């Protein structure tokens, strides 16, 4: 039975509840083209996010700190989101096309103390590192289908996610008003503006589904937009998580895949 103190409005609490009730339910599928797909169950999501939460704590990231997530649509994006809500750290999703002044601005304006980056975005990050002195830690997610070499300068996130044993992290926040993310606007009329998204937004997404989307239990959702955008999270990521239906994600937007 799920622990009574868990609040399903908080994403990491919801994942823990679902992992106990329906551990093998396929909740997310990440397409890999000719390399197949990554299928993520509630158990996978809970365990790997918890491993990542432990890593963040060990690297000095604590409740209220911000950390960037800079990648295409990969499983590590969702692990990062759930890990952040586990410890009360605030995730800053960064569009994988960002570079130069825009990337530097997003990292400095948000006060990010760490970045979780996929390997194909690492070069863009390295170009601005000298101008982002407050970063404490960088973890790199290597994608098997890209075949890019491991950099010895940074922590390989894959090693953490694949651990057989780790010191589990208990849920560290209970206040649904605690910020979950800072999502930045496009900045078409000036610098991008950071919008704080509280944990109670998860509950609002569920209400939106009941009123607007009205997904059914046998529906399969598809998303080709970047998960760094609020629309992709509201329409596919969070509804699938709450309802136990499958959402399929493409790593990047291409018109030919729609």
Regions found by a protein language model. Name each.
Residues 58-59, 86-159:
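Structural core segment of the AMP-binding/adenylate-forming
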Residues 71-74, 95, 215, 225-229:
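Conserved AMP-binding
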Residues 203-220, 228-258:
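Conserved AMP-binding/adenylation subdomain of ANL enzymes
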Residues 24-74, 78, 82, 99-104, ...:
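Conserved AMP-binding/adenylate-forming core of the ANL superfamily
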Residues 4-29, 47:
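A short N-terminal helical cap/helix-turn-helix that marks the beginning
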Residues 39-43, 180-205:
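Conserved AMP-binding A3 loop
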Residues 8, 23-26, 139, 164-184, ...:
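Conserved pre-ATP/AMP-binding loop-to-beta segment of ANL
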Residues 65, 72-92, 96-100, 108-114, ...:
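A short helix-loop-beta submotif of the ANL/AMP-binding
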């Amino acid at each position: 039975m799920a622990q009574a103190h868990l609040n399903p409005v908080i994403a990491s609490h919801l994942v823990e509840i679902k992992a106990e009730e329906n551990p093998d339910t396929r909740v997310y599928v990440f397409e890999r083209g000719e390399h197949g797909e990554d299928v993520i169950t509630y158990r996978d999501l809970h365990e790997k996010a918890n491993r990542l939460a432990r890593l963040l704590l060990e690297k000095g990231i604590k409740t209220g700190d911000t950390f960037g997530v800079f990648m295409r649509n990969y499983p590590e994006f969702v692990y990062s989101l759930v890990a952040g809500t586990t410890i009360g750290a605030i995730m800053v999703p960064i569009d994988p096309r960002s570079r130069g002044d825009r990337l530097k601005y997003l990292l400095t304006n948000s006060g990010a103390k760490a970045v979780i980056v996929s390997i194909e975005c690492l070069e863009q990050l390295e170009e601005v590192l000298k101008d982002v002195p407050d970063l404490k830690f960088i973890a790199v997610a290597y994608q098997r289908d890209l075949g890019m070499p491991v950099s010895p300068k940074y922590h390989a996130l894959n090693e953490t996610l694949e651990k057989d044993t780790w010191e589990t992290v208990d849920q560290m926040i209970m206040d649904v008003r605690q910020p979950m993310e800072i999502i930045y606007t496009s900045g078409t009329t000036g610098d991008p503006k950071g919008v704080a998204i509280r944990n109670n937004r998860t509950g609002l997404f569920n209400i939106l589904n009941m009123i607007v989307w009205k997904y059914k239990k046998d529906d399969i959702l598809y998303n080709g937009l970047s998960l760094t955008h609020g629309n992709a999270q509201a329409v596919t990521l969070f509804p699938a998580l709450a309802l136990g239906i499958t959402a399929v994600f493409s790593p990047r937007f291409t018109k030919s895949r729609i």
